[in-house]
Amino acid sequence: MSFDYTDPTFRNYPFPHYCDFDRHQHCDHDLRTNPPPTEPPSRKSKLMSTSENKGKQPLHPPPTEGFPKPPPPPSSTPTTPTPPDQTKAPEPIEKRIIHAFHAEPKTHTNGEAPPAFNPNNMNAVPLNLLNINLKYSPVTNSIANPKQTEAIGKAWVRILQIDPANVFLYAIDLARACADAGSSPEADIIGANEDLNPVVERNALAGVVRDFCPLRAFCAYYSRVVWNLMIKADQPPANWMKSGIDEGAKFAAFDFFHGVLSPASLYVPLERHPTAAERIANQAMFAVKIANAPGNGSELTMDHVAFTKGRITADSKPRPTPFNT
C-alpha cells in the first residue's frame, strides 16, 4: 500500500489515511473498514519547501475543487448569507500543524490567567521576582548574626565595664586568640591584651559570649578579619603543627575556618582567598579530630545506640572537645 504524501487530503495522524476534515475534528476513518483508494488522485500538488517532503504538508496547498465535499445537513432556521468582504480567511498551514501535533499549554489555573500578585496570599504567583520588595540577609546556625554580636557588645559594656568605643577591638582580639587555642565549649582561652584599656581576661569575654551563642559561631562571624590579620602578619595559628596539617596549608588550621568564605560572616575584602589545599586540609583536620575523639569510657567513636547497645562503663567521664586535646 502506498500513499501520496503530497496530496492535500492525506493525513498521517493517528494513522495514514485520506481525510478532508480540518484538524481531524470529525475524523472516524479506519483502514480496516474504509481502506484508502488504491489509485492516488491524478491532480498533483505543488512542490514543498524542502527536499525531504515525506509526511509533511506543503506550505501553500493547492485548491481542492476536484475533490467535492459532502453537502451540509439542511438547517431548519434560515441563515443570512455572509457578505464576501466578511468571509473568514483560511487558517495558515503553519498554525494548523501546530494545533495538530502540539497540545495547548495548561497551567495550574486550568488555562485561566494567573491572578495579580498579592503578598497577603500564601499561594500568590510572583510573575516578576524583581517586583517583590524583599531583602534577605544570609543566616546560619554555625555563624553568629549581627543582632547577637550587638547584644554581646552591650553585655561586655554592662558586665565587664568595657569602653563602648572599643568593643570591636575586644571582639577581634578574642577571635584571634581562639584561632590559636580553639573555640570549643571546653576551650580555656587564656591571657589578655595589655594594649586595651581596661585589661580584661579573654576567658571572661568568652564567658559572656557563651551566654548568647556558641563561641565558635561568634569567632566565625569575624573569621574574615582574623584571616586577614594572620595573612598580613604571616602568623598562622599557633597549633597548626599539632593539627597535623601540611605547612602549605597551615593558615587553615583553626576550627572556625568555615566562616572565611561564608556570606553570613562579617564581610571584609580578603587579603587572598583560601586555596583548595587549605580547604581540603581544614576538612581533613575536622575528620581526624572527630575520629580520634574519645568516647564515654569506650573505644567507640559514636554514642549512637546502634554502636553502644545502651552500655556504659564505670570509668565514664565527660568527653573533651576534639579541639581541646
UniProtKB/Swiss-Prot annotation:
Residues 59-84 have a biased composition (Pro residues). Signal peptide: none annotated. Its main location: virion. Keywords: Capsid protein, Helical capsid protein, Ribonucleoprotein, Virion. GO terms for cellular component: helical viral capsid; ribonucleoprotein complex. InterPro entries: Pltvir_coat (IPR000052). One of its GO terms (molecular function) is structural molecule activity. The keyword Ribonucleoprotein applies. It is found in: Virion. Residues 30-89 are annotated as: Disordered. Required for genome encapsidation. Forms ribonucleoprotein complexes along with TGB1 helicase and viral RNA. Belongs to the potexviruses coat protein family. This is Capsid protein. It comes from Indian citrus ringspot virus (isolate Kinnow mandarin/India/K1/1996) (ICRSV).
